[in-house]
């Protein structure tokens, strides 16, 4: 199935690219998410007419993500207190939601979907470098310090 991409899609293409994808991927993901339209002649003409508007909107989203990344870098580190045992093992764990809430409380709006924990939840006290994925072109990181709650 031929579609026109309305956004940059990893390993597929960028804005305005006409690509061939499996019909299920187009019907179940690209089209409902608004990331692509069918590549009919009418849609091609309509897209070319709106191309500047779409590019401006994407540039605005990118600029917003870069501004948020600068705020995260300026924040440098965030501290989370959690109950733990004598050896530094936490009672429970610190997940993406906890980290996102701590960063948001520190003044930078972050959602749990933007926090990346490739090794899973944090289960001990210490300092951890956490990746933050704000946009497909904007990644940053922040130091999370987990301390024992008094």
From Swiss-Prot:
Protein's name in the database: Large ribosomal subunit protein bL9
Molecular functions per Gene Ontology: rRNA binding; structural constituent of ribosome
Keywords: Ribonucleoprotein, Ribosomal protein, RNA-binding, rRNA-binding
Family: Belongs to the bacterial ribosomal protein bL9 family.
Single Gene Ontology BP annotation: translation
Any Gene Ontology CC annotation: ribonucleoprotein complex
Superkingdom of this protein's organism: Bacteria
Keyword match Transferase: no
UniProt function note: Binds to the 23S rRNA.
Lineage, highest ranks first: Bacteria, Pseudomonadati, Pseudomonadota, Gammaproteobacteria, Alteromonadales
């Amino acid at each position: 199935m031929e579609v026109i991409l309305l956004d940059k899609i990893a390993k597929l293409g960028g804005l305005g690219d006409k690509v061939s994808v499996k019909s299920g991927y187009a019907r179940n993901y690209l089209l409902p998410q608004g990331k692509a339209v069918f590549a009919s002649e009418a849609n091609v003409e309509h897209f070319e007419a709106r191309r500047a508007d779409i590019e401006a909107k994407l540039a605005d989203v990118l600029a917003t993500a870069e501004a948020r990344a600068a705020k995260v870098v300026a924040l440098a580190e965030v501290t989370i207190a959690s109950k733990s045992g004598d050896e530094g093992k936490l009672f429970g764990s610190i997940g993406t939601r906890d980290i996102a809430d701590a960063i948001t409380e520190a003044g930078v709006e972050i959602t749990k979907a933007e926090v990346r924990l490739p090794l899973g939840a944090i289960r001990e006290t210490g300092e951890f470098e956490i990746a933050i994925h704000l946009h497909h072109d904007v990644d940053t990181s922040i130091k999370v310090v987990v301390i024992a709650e008094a």
